[in-house]
Amino acid sequence: MCGIVGFTAPGQDPAAAKQIVQGMADLIRHRGPDGEGCYADGTAALGHRRLSVIDLAGGGQPMLNEDGTLVVVFNGEIYNYKTLRARLQQRGHKFATDSDTEVLLHGYEEWGRDLPCRLRGMFAFAVWDRKRGTLFCARDLFGIKPLCYYKKGETLLFASEIKAFLAHPAFEKRLNEARLPDWLSMEYLPDAETLFTGVYELPPAHTLTWQAGRVTLARYAAPRFRAKRGRSLRAWAREIGDAVAESADAHRIADVEVGCFLSGGVDSSLITCEMARRQPAVQCFSVGYAEEAYSELPAARAAAQALGVPLTETTVTADDFFAANRAIQWYLDEPMPNPAEVPLYFLCKAARQRVKVVLSGEGADELFGGYPLYRQAVWAERWQKMPRAVRRALAALLPGCGLLRRGALPRWQRSARANYVFETTQERDKYLKRDYCAPTPAQRCKPYFDAVRGLDEPTAVQWVDWQTWLPRDILRKADRMSMAHSLELRVPFLDRQVLAAAQALPRRYRCTGRRGKIALRAAAARRLPPQLADAPKRGFPVPLADWLRQEKYYALVKAKLTGPAAERFFDTGALCALLDAHRAGKTNAMTKLWAFYCFIEWYEVYFTGKIPPDL
């Protein structure tokens, strides 16, 4: 795992370009403290920060091919690189290292732009082709590894993290304020835009090609649900269990020790179980709070005992939680008010003291139907099939029922993620100082739903999550919080082979109106004790709502909500009224308050403070 940066600027001075790209790489040093390198010529410059995990002595980057016509920088891991290496050797390619990076170089020579289709892994890479004058970039199928870009004239900037652009003189740092309403509603932007004007994320499963100042994006894979009928749950459980086991084994590849995150839930327990079969006494890590009602530690302890693995525990206090948020917003690049990022930050910090790589359970809910959102979609679909007269009668009888309200809307407007923080745009807009006249968040999500009109509702919601929520929230959080501590986090559920099983799974084995992850839990039951296979989903629960009612943290948050940054964007009187109502127990406004707090803290870090900040 590493950090990559680079840019194109035809006619540039190579020596000056080398200094600039070095400065860009320095801003993401946390992604790779083990080594650095840069390359520059009259058109392109590439930089790299290395976290050495495979081929510790070799594998330095940027890496050039034999005649120096190709230069590559790469972030991630290619789990089938040995298979690809053998195939390339059969075709006459000569290798100088044992690294997966060199496989990308020779793979590009052999297969060109079809290379990403052959890769099994998590990756973001860039290949500068001096002969053709093209820069070719690619991002993995799920968006596990980040890649962002910025174009100004003929100059293209790319990097693992947006903050690297701050070191380039062509970058104009401006807030993409028009998208603030969307962000407040969803806690992320569902498309490729970011909260920095002109900065975009390369979408998952896409390539980017720069040539002569022009940029072209192309999708190289499009995962689709194609259910296979006529198989029993037992057969599916066997296939899914085998796919997850094989993926966990593939994800072990490393020349350093690999550990596991263990929460006590079914996802992390299954991954840990497969690791422990091959690596007895695998180091496991969990995080929790002193407030036991919110802590995962008791469940993690029970799981560790059942699996026979050692567990390192980390406890986060309220002081820890608030003190770390400024650093967390810096590492995230864009504001993220998901409270789960804070315990994850401390969990990664603790794990890095013992191992360099961990396996984690992200992606299981999205692939196998684990979220309550999908079960709600089952009920919404049933509601739509009821006779209109029955629906009207029930709606009149239960006027306050959110499911019935949403059930009357078109599918794309029913998406709960579009109204995650605020029930309506009117409720949200009363806190904003100006009218942004923007499309609603649901309208932003409509193209994704339009692309899967033929799917049943819960399956369509899952697919939209794959394109939006998964890369823009779950995986961004996982990447940035682990890389903040130079820790490589791998996600065995997000694997091509596991995906093949998941997208063929009939809906009734993913979720019903009452249960989720049906086939995955059946697969887990073949390997885990019943209390782990049937463990309820917990996520990272936090006692933040309680803390916001305590004088110390109430005062801290109020100071932020009435400061100069808050005054610029928000009605601070309305914010204080919301905080007071929460403190008095009249409402639970934790999600809203934390969203405002995190945006303000992020804005202060990136737009009013020095770069890089003192952390």
Tell me what each language-model feature is.
Residues L141, F346-L404, W469, I474, ...:
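Active-site adenylate/phosphate-handling loop in enzymes that bind or generate adenylated species
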Residues M1-L332, L344, C348, R526, ...:
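Cysteine-centered catalytic environments shared across enzyme families
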Residues E334-N338:
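Acceptor-substrate binding/catalytic loop of class I
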Residues T134-F136, K145-P146, L166, E366-G370, ...:
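Short catalytic/ligand-binding loop motif for oxyanion handling, primarily in non-cytosolic enzymes
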Residues Q329-W330, P372-W379, P612-D614:
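Short secondary-structure boundary/capping segments
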Residues L297-P298, A324-R326, G369-Y374, W547:
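Short aromatic-enriched loop/helix-cap "lid" or pocket-rim segments at secondary-structure transitions
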Residues M1, A167, T197-P204, R214, ...:
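Adenosyl-5′-phosphate
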